[in-house]
């Protein structure tokens, strides 16, 4: 059988890539082109019939050559896979002693990588040969250079990416300095039960923080005017952290489906962490999380700026509000620029603990320049402005130390600012401490992880791992807790009795009524009252005299009348805020246009015109409505033509009685008694006077025509 195989080889070998059975060919394998010989012969010991096949089969052993586990390993591999060929001796295989020396030097790495040593290269099968032959081992020393100590080479091995963590090219993956390599998923530091506990903890905290920040934002929506500058940035700050909490809650619901790549059994690839922006879902989570995290921090800095402008520079709320456009440009522009820069640099990384995607989880440089540095700058600037504002407020408190009430208010405000700032700064400074601690110890943790899994993954073990340290789960839980709890500090600012009252009114539907709507309601009720009452009066006219329902006005002068001449037009009747009866009565009867204006203003109405509209379009379609409005228009016309309103003196007050609102029945012109009170021509001259409506004790005089009437 062996003879038959040899004959077939002799027949078909010349047709395989131009190989000849008894001729040498130039070496084309790049790895072996630097050997002392430049001609080879095939088939080799492993029955490879061309150099391309031999080069492919030699690749699994190249890590031994790269690590230089033996100074002669590369020469041995080339002699085994690409044997030397000379004119005198067709094939020069590696010698047995040479094989034993190389194998003993590289045995540890062979076991580490889990390599399968070819049976054809077992040293027992090789022959002893004369090492003085020129084509053997001596010339090779000219190409290897100075030999290195095996133990010294082993210390410089470094990290080799395990086979199941390798990724396809073009994705930009890089793990522990090795390209096309990704971190394992689930997390490389913790066990499965620890990860489940951490995920549940993050989910609960995210829900709590989401509810707190939403409560702050909804409180703002209930009463927008309550939160003006300088405290308006608190609302935007709470909105940012509500989005951050929502992203962590979504990551809790998704688990590892977004932050990790699924295993590929065909390619023998395991679960790996997502690196880069190729995964759309992970990229979206990263954009929202990083953008609003940075924006929330910037809004806190803007809050300290507005406080400083108000306390230190004595800016008013309106002056600060004029700079709102610049505040928004900075608060949204800087995080947006950083987010776009990270996307362009392909620095998105999946977090297999929380389920979200962020930056700097495995790349220390990205964490240092895009997370740690911006947070440190914000803390420094915000704390400096905050201290400057508090010093200014303390100076103001010392100036007004004799004003006990204002000093107490200012003291409470300073305490409120201090507590709020502490609730924000303490978690943020703790978070910065976690990031700094992680920066210092990350390399040691990674070396320890490689040392723990090198035999399992068949990769070189790090000999420099003298002290093995592993991260504590509590450190990561504190980091996530401080990231989320920062947003809860906004609840302290809105937490007050006023907030409780607003929420109670919101749920009970007892909000404050609009003054304009309230005045319209009063006018509508007045018109409805006149409609009902006027119909009764018309019905009773058959039985009563016209003068029996006449009303008279008593004007009690407070000594403010300065006019010297009598007013032959309509006299102005002033209404004070304390005379509610006079306000309601005069509003209903509208004696003159001037009094109508005053009365409508006192009741919160806009103009007499709106009142005429309410009367012109009553809710009831009865015929009495039109008659009422006609009579009111007629009365105003007569008043404008010169009808005088006559007041009864203080001495006759005992002869009358105060008329309630329901007793007003007559819509005709007012009749006077025998006394006249001189009025001023200026409307403001009667300010402070009090008006009362009484029935005449002695009956009214007969009405005159529509012409002018003057009293003597």
Swiss-Prot record:
Composition-biased stretches (Polar residues): 668-693
Residue stretches spanning the membrane: 202-222, 234-254, 285-305, 325-345, 371-391, 417-437, 474-494
Domain remark in the UniProt entry: Lys-Thr-X-X-X-Trp motif interacts with the PDZ domain of Dvl (Disheveled) family members and is involved in the activation of the Wnt/beta-catenin signaling pathway.
Keyword ATP-binding among record annotations: no
Subcellular location, record wording: Membrane; Cell membrane; Cell surface; Apical cell membrane
Extracellular side: 19-201, 255-284, 346-370, 438-473
GO cellular component, one term: cytoplasmic vesicle membrane
GO function term, MF aspect, one: G protein-coupled receptor activity
PANTHER family cross-referenced by the UniProt entry: FRIZZLED, FRIZZLED-6
Alphabetical UniProt keywords: Cell membrane, Cytoplasmic vesicle, Developmental protein, Disulfide bond, Endoplasmic reticulum, G-protein coupled receptor, Glycoprotein, Membrane, Neurogenesis, Receptor, Signal, Transducer, Transmembrane, Transmembrane helix, Ubl conjugation, Wnt signaling pathway
Biased composition annotated in UniProt, kind: Basic and acidic residues: 628-637, 652-664, 700-712
GO biological process: canonical Wnt signaling pathway; nervous system development; non-canonical Wnt signaling pathway
Function: Receptor for Wnt proteins. Most of frizzled receptors are coupled to the beta-catenin canonical signaling pathway, which leads to the activation of disheveled proteins, inhibition of GSK-3 kinase, nuclear accumulation of beta-catenin and activation of Wnt target genes. A second signaling pathway involving PKC and calcium fluxes has been seen for some family members, but it is not yet clear if it represents a distinct pathway or if it can be integrated in the canonical pathway, as PKC seems to be required for Wnt-mediated inactivation of GSK-3 kinase.
Post-translational modification: Ubiquitinated by ZNRF3, leading to its degradation by the proteasome.
Family classification: Belongs to the G-protein coupled receptor Fz/Smo family.
Motif Lys-Thr-X-X-X-Trp motif, mediates interaction with the PDZ domain of Dvl family members: positions: 498-503
Major subcellular location class: membrane
Subunit structure: Interacts with LMBR1L.
Region feature (Disordered): 588-712
Glycosylation: residue positions: 38, 352
Membrane topology: Multi-pass membrane protein
Origin species: Canis lupus familiaris
Signal peptide start-end: 1-18
Disulfide bonds: 24-85, 32-78, 69-106, 95-129, 99-123
Cytoplasmic side: 223-233, 306-324, 392-416, 495-712
The protein's name: Frizzled-6
Pfam families linked to this entry: Frizzled, Fz
